């Protein structure tokens, strides 16, 4: 994004892929007690739920073509969305755990929104990192409330409730999902939510809240181990 914005490139391919559902991958994350021990698939990946117990590993990938407007128009590309901001911070709190106050994640969201040249109230949807671990979901909820306010109407969901955690591919596929949400004006549901954790005081996208008609801006959060926080601000494309 920055390479293109600052004129060092016209077009770049970005993305990630992951295929780590194997003995070593599972053993490593199990040792960290990050994986859900639930055997029932319907109870295994429950972002923001009171009874969440960890994440489910997933496999997959996504590639996004980023290019400047002139380049896209010259080749008659179908433009799906616009990247308008980016934020990046590091908690420097713990080797794996995020800062429980959500301070670093909040700063990354604020950076992305500021670069987009908008105020937080213009953002209608947050694609949360939402791993279904206790530490991430409670801390990320605090961070969202720091940025948008506790009584904000911004809608939030974690698509890891459907895809599992794609690890190195999570950011790419969740950015693609967020772009599609903007284009289709359809918010992805946070499936599997039975009882919202009181520590996660945010507006979750449930089955009856997926349709929207005025979604112009959204952000996608990627909050990695060790508090490595990256946030994309995206805008619905219009001529």
Where in this protein do the model-derived segments appear?
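Conserved small-residue
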Residues: 29, 65, 83, 123, ...
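Cys-dependent condensing catalytic cores that perform Claisen condensation/acyl-transfer
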Residues: 1-43, 152, 174, 239
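Flexible, low-complexity linker/loop segments at domain and module junctions
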Residues: 116-122, 201-239
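Conserved catalytic cysteine-centered active-site region
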Residues: 31-56, 141-172
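Active-site-proximal alpha-helical scaffold in enzymes
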Residues: 1-18, 56-77, 165-187, 232
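Beta-strand segments within the central parallel beta-sheet cores of soluble alpha/beta enzyme folds
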Residues: 9-17, 78-86, 121-128, 154-161, ...
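Condensing-enzyme catalytic core mediating Claisen C-C bond formation in acyl metabolism
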Residues: 40-116, 125, 239
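Active-site-adjacent elements of ketosynthase-type condensing enzymes
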Residues: 19-45, 87-107, 131-143, 184-217
């Amino acid at each position: 994004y920055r390479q293109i914005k600052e004129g060092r490139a016209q077009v770049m391919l970005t993305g990630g892929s992951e295929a780590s559902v194997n003995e070593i991958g599972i053993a490593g994350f199990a040792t960290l007690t990050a994986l859900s021990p639930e055997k029932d698939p319907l109870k295994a990946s429950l972002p923001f739920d009171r009874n969440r117990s960890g994440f489910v590993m997933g496999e997959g990938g996504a590639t996004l073509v980023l290019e400047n407007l002139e380049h896209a128009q010259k080749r008659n590309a179908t433009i799906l969305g616009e990247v308008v901001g980016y934020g990046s911070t590091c908690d420097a709190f713990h080797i794996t755990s995020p800062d429980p106050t959500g301070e670093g994640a909040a700063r990354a969201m604020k950076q992305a929104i500021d670069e987009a040249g908008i105020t937080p109230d213009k953002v209608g949807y947050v694609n949360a990192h939402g791993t279904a671990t206790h530490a991430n979901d409670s801390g990320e909820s605090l961070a969202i409330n720091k940025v948008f306010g506790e009584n904000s109407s911004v809608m939030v969901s974690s698509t890891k409730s459907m895809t599992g955690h794609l690890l190195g591919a999570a950011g790419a596929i969740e950015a693609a999902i967020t772009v599609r949400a903007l284009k289709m004006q359809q918010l992805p549901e946070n499936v599997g939510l039975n009882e919202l954790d009181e520590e996660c005081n945010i507006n979750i996208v449930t089955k009856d809240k997926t349709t929207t008609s005025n979604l112009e801006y959204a952000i996608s959060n990627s909050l990695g181990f060790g508090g490595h926080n990256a946030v994309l601000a995206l805008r619905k494309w219009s001529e």
